[in-house]
Amino acid sequence: MIVSNEPGYYVVNEFGIRIENLLEVVNATADGSYLAFKPLTHIPIQKNLIEVDLMERNEVKWLDDYHAEVRNKVMPLLTSEESKAWLLENTSPLLAKE
């Protein structure tokens, strides 16, 4: 099954933001008793619009993990050095490795 995840925030007549991703519902356990989401859309989330100070550490880790997955999936498909540099810049971790 494929679902759309579209969290958003809007202030009437001022601004709005929405992040949209397609997700595949997959088994999280061998017996299928728990489900999880696997991203199908591999596009970086624009980091310069994020207030990192408002995020919990686990939320920043999720974003860093998502960006690592985007980088790993998309980088082999790119041919130009300019595109590769853009992807590296836009998927770099927010958290320093511990």
Placement of each model-derived feature along the sequence:
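Charged, cofactor-coupling segments
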Residues: 1-98
